[in-house]
Amino acid sequence: MISRSYTNLLDLASGNFPVMGRERRRLPRVMTVPGNVSEFDEDQAYSVSSDNPSSVSSDRMIIVANRLPLKAEKRNGSWSFSWDQDSLYLQLKDGLPEDMEILYVGSLSVDVDSNEQDDVAQILLDKFKCVPTFFPPDLQSKFYDGFCKRQIWPLFHYMLPFSADHGGRFDRSLWEAYVATNKLFFQKVIEVINPDDDFVWIHDYHLMVLPTFLRRRFNRIRMGFFLHSPFPSSEIYRSLPVREEILKALLNSDLIGFHTFDYARHFLTCCSRMLGLEYQSKRGYIGLEYYGRTVGIKIMPVGINMGRIQSVMRYSEEEGKVMELRNRFEGKTVLLGIDDMDIFKGINLKLLAMEQMLRQHPNWRGRAVLVQIVNPARGKGIDVEEIRGEIEESCRRINGEFGKPGYQPIIYIDTPVSINEINAYYHIAECVVVTAVRDGMNLTPYEYIVCRQGLLGSESDFSGPKKSMLVASEFIGCSPSLSGAIRVNPWNVEATGEALNEALSMSDAEKQLRHEKHFRYVSTHDVAYWSRSFLQDLERICVDHFKKRCWGMGISFGFRVVALDPNFRKLSIPCIVSDYKRAKSRAILLDYDGTLMPQNSINKAPSQEVLNFLDALCEDKKNSIFIVSGRGRESLSKWFTPCKKIGIAAEHGYFLKWSGSEEWETCGQSSDFGWMQIVEPVMKQYTESTDGSSIEIKESALVWQYRDADPGFGSLQAKEMLEHLESVLANEPVAVKSGHYIVEVKPQGVSKGSVSEKIFSSMAGKGKPVDFVLCIGDDRSDEDMFEAIGNAMSKRLLCDNALVFACTVGQKPSKAKYYLDDTTEVTCMLESLAEASEASNFSMRELDEAL
């Protein structure tokens, strides 16, 4: 383990650092780059970048956050450090296994001189298992005060930079500082990580690009990310100039956590609209398929530490704080607000709502008191000073209008308040009010509920039933979990004022019922429950890491790891040519779009080069060549007229022609297309109401495609259409299927797989059982062909020793065992096979002439 921290930050940022790691024994693993399965060499086995497991068998958790869970103070020239008991990152260890070692990587809340950094790092590592990250002051300012607080924080809270003074326009230099800082965190993680035994849990928006640095270095690292702030809707997020870079960086995690479904839904929508990714929900788990990896989406609001609050409550009693406040507010009904000085906390809206209640319900004048505690601002900026001025002006106005000797309706506290005193306020408050206009979670209501439950048998224990009341903004993360709270739209000041009156006027019995319901939830869904649940899901989603072959692709933040079956490998042209030459009866099945022709090609007709290669292959008597496509038979017949001996399976095999001179035959079970009269009007209706969609009318099928429509609306319409068509076509001999941006209705039993089996069966029936199969395709419909080849072997439609090459175009998850990168490689392979056939035919002619 590393014992010293780096001080040369220029070397660190540029990546010039020594590779160090814990010693480990060598074990065979699947390689992380394309190639054969083998053991790593000695250098790889002892490199920190290796994916080999260590000799240490127990798991370890590395928690990476912007701030370490430490308090630091320098006294008389020496440093003093202690745990910050209120830090979430310290509290979450309660939910992790007792034997799991925990390391923390993060920065300190104080500046440390460069000549002291090594000594401080050693102390923190030895005594606290913390690895500090140190930054130059200018980088820290650009990273935290600049990009994090002026750009990401406002945007994630739905504030667009309409002007230079409103949220801050995008500054490329601040983004570069953000990336550089994330890279420094990465350098610290690799000092201590054992990539095969450790879990890495990254926290919050400060470190959103860190997953890319770690995934690039360690392809199989087990890594989770949790966002503690809101995630904005796609309409807001898309305004960020580096939107795709951040999304792709987050997707290098294995598990991404959010507090609420709304935040997760916004993230999934952004991935759909900006990256074209689709998510699936299986058995209660949401996952995004991303280049062979499943990125899990976790929805779990964080909880509080019950033990910590109980301890503080006990201490508050010992100090007499509770009794002191009860005496001070005797005869008054206390409402309580505790917020950071932040433009999103809605503090002034709360004051206006209190003013509204006092104006509309005079009976509360002289009785109701709102105690508003304001914590220091975490960020800097003109917005904070403006909102502070508004709050202070509202307090003066309301107290001036409704106050009297011995009574102030608003008690505004903007000086530091100890946690013991805050807990005492929780005890005496009849209602806690949270009016944030946007907030990630906000645990104030949870803390209040626990404090109102009290300590059994204590001096502050309520006589009679426990009760509490909440008025909570519907825009905070904890709101969905508190069904007994009065939810408000804080922008509607009048309605919020009425909610305050309702909360204070509610019967004690009703308050008791709501309190009991809330306490049951809060006490069972604490921070330990949250961290334990996250780790369990992270373990589940990473269980197959070492069963797949992984390699990295892309540069910069376009980097991603492709994870595929270890048996999935690139088709070697020399090897297949060698096997091709030895075969006596060959079947070659080729998809068209995306296989012989690029998908984005404007001219869809095959090139003369491709036609020449196919024609040469058809001239070989050992070959049976088929184009198997979803296209109509008219266009395919026209394009492949020069290849007289080529077979064509059109419309996914509904129509089949064995060669150019033969007639078309149908492979469907039914020739009745009356169902089209039902389907076409339905599709037309959805086309008219879905901009960007269209209908493709084939002889045997109807396809509704929405590739150019709004992804979210198109997907919604497709799902509704699918259900509608399945209902009205229940008694028709058709199959209704959804695909990649399509809904297709076609006759039952029609697929590329079924026509492939028919071809193999026919060749076997003619005494030419196939001993060589080459099948190439690029999309979902071609997966049926790949599956049919396996079925043909078990059904003995092929020779027992048949050589089978199922090949997909592009490196992606597939039932095929081989891949070629693109259509150019497919053409090169066809050229090599054609040359082999021509050479064989030439040899045969020479032999005939010699005889």
Swiss-Prot record:
InterPro entries assigned to the protein according to its UniProt record, in alphabetical order: Glyco_trans_20 (IPR001830), HAD-like_sf (IPR036412), HAD-SF_hydro_IIB (IPR006379), HAD_sf (IPR023214), Trehalose_PPase (IPR003337)
Residues the record lists as Phosphothreonine modifications: 32
GO biological processes: trehalose biosynthetic process
Glycosyltransferase as annotated region, ranges: 59-540
Xref: CDD domains: GT20_TPS, HAD_TPP
Short name of one Pfam family: Trehalose_PPase
Keywords annotated in UniProt: Glycosyltransferase, Phosphoprotein, Transferase
Record's catalysed reaction(s): D-glucose 6-phosphate + UDP-alpha-D-glucose = alpha,alpha-trehalose 6-phosphate + UDP + H(+)
EC number: 2.4.1.15
Keyword Glycosyltransferase: yes
Keyword Ubl conjugation: no
PTM section of the record: Phosphorylated.
Top class in the EC scheme: transferase
GO MF annotation list: glycosyltransferase activity
Family of the protein in this entry: In the N-terminal section; belongs to the glycosyltransferase 20 family. In the C-terminal section; belongs to the trehalose phosphatase family.
Protein name: Probable alpha,alpha-trehalose-phosphate synthase [UDP-forming] 7
Organism: Arabidopsis thaliana (Mouse-ear cress)
